[in-house]
Design a protein with these regions (language model features):
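Glycine-rich phosphate-binding loop of ATP-dependent small-molecule kinases
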Residues: 1-191
Length: 191
């Protein structure tokens, strides 16, 4: 599906700022409606490393009332978390009624990366994907609104952005060997 996208379409930063401004204002209003109606909302940002998830998240949360949302950056599971059931750590971050939970990555990369790098069998990956489907279905059945975004860039653009981040002293910390290794294996993750 992603291979059908035209990645040559661009937007200037100025055009982006103009288009996003009324949407951010609307988001602030919607957050209060969510609070008043007791709706739990899960907003998930996924995408390639260096695709801009952090920048988009920063831009979005500036409009929100900090009393009514949590932001979670999902990292690799800790030793303790690996001893627990697959989704245990994610169950702990579910928003209460009336609140937003905003995820910088979620439960998907654990399965996707393990599958792409052939660290698990296809059967094990399918079992985890089934667990994700059940988890999300339970959230939706209990009234949660789940909104998912995937920020897509080409392998070439990702490499360019990783190099740019690595070359800048103030952003070099954001890039590691795993990012470059994953970039070389881009098509394993892509399929």
């Amino acid at each position: 599906m992603l291979d059908k996208l035209n990645l040559d379409v661009t937007m200037t930063k100025e055009a982006y700022r103009e288009e996003i401004k009324p949407l951010k204002e609307r988001l602030a209003v919607l957050q209060h409606e969510v609070k008043n109606n007791g709706l739990p909302v899960m907003v998930i940002f996924e995408g390639w490393s260096a695709a801009g998830k952090g920048s988009v998240l920063s831009d979005v949360i500036l409009q929100l009332d900090p009393r009514n949302f949590t932001a979670k950056s999902t990292q690799n599971p800790t030793t303790e978390e690996k001893r627990e059931p697959f989704l245990w750590r994610h169950w702990r971050s579910i928003p209460r009624a009336g609140l937003f939970a905003i995820y910088d990555r979620s439960w998907y990369p654990e399965v996707g990366a393990a599958r792409a790098e052939k660290l698990v069998t296809s059967a094990a990956a399918l079992e985890k994907m089934d667990s994700i489907n059940v988890f999300e279905r339970q959230m939706a059945d209990d009234g949660a609104l789940i909104i998912k975004f995937f920020l897509h860039i080409s392998q070439k653009e990702q490499k360019k952005r990783l190099d740019g981040l690595a070359a800048n002293k103030s952003t070099a910390w954001r890039v590691n060997k795993e990012d470059y290794r994953n970039n070389k294996q881009y098509h394993n993750f892509y399929r």
